[in-house]
Curated annotation (Swiss-Prot):
Reactions listed under catalytic activity: 3-phosphoshikimate + phosphoenolpyruvate = 5-O-(1-carboxyvinyl)-3-phosphoshikimate + phosphate
Keywords: Amino-acid biosynthesis, Aromatic amino acid biosynthesis, Cytoplasm, Transferase
PANTHER family listed in its UniProt record: AROM/DEHYDROQUINATE SYNTHASE, PENTAFUNCTIONAL AROM POLYPEPTIDE
Compartments, as annotated in UniProt: Cytoplasm
GO molecular function (one): 3-phosphoshikimate 1-carboxyvinyltransferase activity
Family membership noted in the UniProt record: Belongs to the EPSP synthase family.
Family annotation (InterPro entries): Enolpyruvate_Tfrase_dom, Enolpyruvate_Tfrase_sf, EPSP_synthase, EPSP_synthase_CS, RNA3'P_cycl/enolpyr_Trfase_a/b
Pathway(s) this gene product operates in, as recorded in its UniProt entry: Metabolic intermediate biosynthesis; chorismate biosynthesis
Any one cellular-component term (Gene Ontology): cytoplasm
Protein name: 3-phosphoshikimate 1-carboxyvinyltransferase
UniProt: 3-phosphoshikimate binding residues: 20-21, 25, 154-156, 181, 296, 323
Gene this protein is translated from: aroA
Annotated EC: 2.5.1.19
Residues in coiled coil: none
Length: 414
């Protein structure tokens, strides 16, 4: 798919894309209780989660209603994923808790991602692995209710272990510092507690005392990280937008912190009663921000930094190298295509903002990374541009291009 973008000014109201992080967690909750998700958007990552719980015995009706099995067991000995890192990393400890043997594989982008920390951890507790990368055969059953794991590679392992210890009727997790993307662990803890469980997270330890979980019927709330590209598009293009279907921002740093970050850079950016109000200003300020706890915000911040006055610095970026693409290099390349300079350091990237009228009109290959396409499309709204392999947005937000059209973006889709 090729998308041609012409100079446009974004305006209007848009519904935030459903949070795939929340959708995947809700789908995995169907291992324990009945879940009915209204109007579920079937992104590639969500489909990976659906196929995973189906392989563990969950009955799935119309890709929206999920009924837990009477007994959890591995129904399929081979689980093939597409590209969902969240699903993969949560699935590994879950199948280890259920016990048995299963082989997991995925597309090349996911095969490149490291699994070292979860393999190291679970190998100490009765689990055998064929390797530390995909394809991966997992054999055995967790022999302990008290798990130690390094927290530097991915928070998704810890989220998966919270599910695993619910399967085992309780236990504890000790996370060896540093703890990366802590906000996503807090999301999992909050979700279980909201459904009736008893999960405590203090310092670097999590204690799980399961209770019967309540059923859920409703729609998946919006995703601040994905919605931020609509905000970025409005700010870059000189427009305004209102984004609805968003939960109130939490106090801890996470994807929702983008509301405050954009405001600190000079934009009108306010949350009120489930709506995020965004309006462009004539100029924006540079910023220094650590995104280790919310790495998915990197490209939105980089996009606005490209046209901000001065030099911005995004730190805590080390794990961006193991996303759908090497996102540090992707940010550098995309900014360079638009004529924006940047400098990569060991754990940070400097972005040298320019006047937006000086932005180029390049052709951008999205590198099979949905966020590359979204960042580039926002910058292209100033002087135009072309996105190739633009179908990559289907990984998280299949409606992205249609949403831009509804916000008055001038684009053609080939």
């Amino acid at each position: 798919m090729i998308v041609r973008i012409y100079p446009s000014e974004i305006s209007g109201t848009i519904k935030a894309p459903q949070s795939k992080s929340l959708a995947i967690r809700l789908i995995f909750l169907s291992l324990f209780t009945r879940i009915h998700l209204h109007n579920l958007v079937l992104s590639e990552d969500v489909i990976d989660a659906i196929n995973s719980v189906r392989a563990l015995g969950v009955e799935v009706k119309n890709n929206s209603e999920f009924i837990p099995p009477e007994k959890l067991e591995i129904k399929k000995k081979f689980i093939k994923l597409k590209g969902s890192g969240t699903t993969l990393r949560m699935l590994i400890p879950i199948v280890a808790a259920i016990g048995g043997e299963v082989t997991i594989d995925a597309e090349e982008s996911l095969r490149r991602r490291p699994l070292k920390r979860i393999v190291e951890a679970l190998s100490n507790y009765g689990i055998s692995f064929s390797s530390s990368s995909l394809p991966l055969t997992i054999t055995g059953k967790l022999s302990s209710y008290n798990i130690k794991i390094s927290g530097d590679e991915s928070s998704q392992y810890i989220s998966g272990l919270i599910y695993a210890l619910h399967i085992l009727n309780g236990g504890s997790i000790e996370i060896l510092p540093p703890i990366s993307s802590k906000s996503y662990i807090l999301l999992t803890v909050d979700l279980f507690n909201r459904f009736g469980s008893n999960v405590k997270f203090y310092g670097n330890k999590i204690h799980i005392n399961p209770n019967n979980l309540v059923e859920f019927q409703g729609e998946v709330a919006g995703d601040y990280g994905l919605a931020s590209f609509y905000a970025l598009s409005a700010l870059v293009s000189g427009g305004r937008t209102t984004i609805v279907n968003l939960w109130e921002p939490k106090e801890y740093f996470g994807d929702h912190s983008i509301v405050k970050i954009l405001k600190e850079m000079g934009a009108t950016s306010e949350y009120l009663d489930g709506k995020w109000y965004v309006e462009a200003k004539d100029k924006y300020s540079s910023i220094k921000v650590n995104i280790d706890d919310a790495p998915d915000l990197a490209m939105t911040i980089a996009g606005l930094a490209a046209i901000a006055e001065g030099t911005s610095e995004i730190t805590g970026i080390e794990r961006l190298r193991i996303k759908e693409s090497d996102r540090i290099e992707s940010i550098r390349k995309v900014l360079g295509l638009y004529g924006v300079g940047s400098e990569v350091k060991s754990n940070s990237i400097l972005i040298f903002g320019i006047n937006k009228r000086m932005l180029s009109s390049p052709i951008t290959d999205c590198l099979n990374d949905h966020r590359v396409a979204m960042m580039s499309s926002a910058l292209a709204l100033v002087n135009g541009g072309v996105i190739t392999s633009a179908e990559c947005v289907s990984k998280s937000n299949p409606n992205y291009w249609q949403d831009l059209l509804s916000l008055n973006a001038k684009i053609s889709i080939e």
